[in-house]
Amino acid sequence: MPLMKFKPTSPGRRSAVRVVTPDLHKGAPHAALLDSQSKSGGRNHHGRITVRHVGGGHKQHYRIIDFKRNKEGIPARVERIEYDPNRTAHIALLCYVDGERRYIIAPKGLKAGDQVIAGANAPIKTGNTLPLRNIPVGTTVHGIELKPGKGAQIARAAGAAVQLVAREGIYATLRLRSGEMRKVPVECRATIGEVGNDEHNLEKLGKAGAKRWRGVRPTVRGAAMNPVDHPHGGGEAKAGQGNPHPVTPWGVPTKGYKTRKNKRTQQFIVRDRRG
């Protein structure tokens, strides 16, 4: 997909870069697969901010995505590729031969009119879903389950791809985009191919307002705050942070400090993403 730049009629348009998507559906989404969403503004049930930089943004309907692909052995035709405001990837509307319609994450190269199928004996073709034990080593996949039957959890964003590098016993070894090598049960399902809209990372919003449309509020530096608001705050004029290492607003070291606590799944990580 080509990139589109704009005439510099304003500072915001001067630096904006958009991905041209002529193949996307121009009309409304499939109404039966929509659900309502309410905004919290980053507040919990007490009304206190628990997630910073969240608030505002355009109203959106949630698109119900089929992450499980549990309609086995029934072929489906791709009706159209659609935009989804809730994720960076595009979505594909499938129409099964029995008349049911479902949304899936659109893989790269999938287009209207293509046929896909899910099942243990599905052919190795873009958009098809099958267990890792039946996928050849070296194949690029996305939408991978971490537990059999739970639904896709890994590699769902635009341009995401994972390579199946080995299979031994009840586990398959995957190489993630981050460099991490991870073991996953061979009964877990994955979809062939990589996620589409892979040029999403080349987009530039161009102005702060485009970020606000997406529900993202400004991020303020700690050094620009008062001492009551942040450990880096206070001081006369542009003072240093006053700490031997930079910290979060709650005093936890940042910039490289490991915060992962889930030792239960550490055994499945063969190689850390940091090398």
Swiss-Prot record:
What GO biological process, any one, is recorded here?
A: cytoplasmic translation
Q: State the source organism's domain of life.
A: Bacteria
Q: Name one Pfam family in it.
A: Ribosomal_L2
Q: Which InterPro entries match?
A: NA-bd_OB-fold (IPR012340), Rib_uL2_dom2 (IPR014722), Ribosomal_uL2 (IPR002171), Ribosomal_uL2_bac/org-type (IPR005880), Ribosomal_uL2_C (IPR022669), Ribosomal_uL2_CS (IPR022671), Ribosomal_uL2_dom3 (IPR014726), Ribosomal_uL2_RNA-bd_dom (IPR022666)
Q: What's an example GO cellular component term for this entry?
A: large ribosomal subunit
GO-annotated molecular function: rRNA binding; structural constituent of ribosome; transferase activity
Q: Where are the annotated segments for Disordered?
A: 224-275
Q: What does this protein do?
A: One of the primary rRNA binding proteins. Required for association of the 30S and 50S subunits to form the 70S ribosome, for tRNA binding and peptide bond formation. It has been suggested to have peptidyltransferase activity; this is somewhat controversial. Makes several contacts with the 16S rRNA in the 70S ribosome.
PANTHER family per record: LARGE RIBOSOMAL SUBUNIT PROTEIN UL2M, RIBOSOMAL PROTEIN L2
What HAMAP family does the entry give?
Answer: Ribosomal_uL2_B (MF_01320_B)
State the family it belongs to. Answer: Belongs to the universal ribosomal protein uL2 family.
**What quaternary arrangement does the UniProt entry report?**
Part of the 50S ribosomal subunit. Forms a bridge to the 30S subunit in the 70S ribosome.
The protein depicted here goes by the name Large ribosomal subunit protein uL2
Q: Which organism is it from?
A: Xanthomonas euvesicatoria pv. vesicatoria (strain 85-10)
Organism phylogeny: Bacteria, Pseudomonadati, Pseudomonadota, Gammaproteobacteria, Lysobacterales
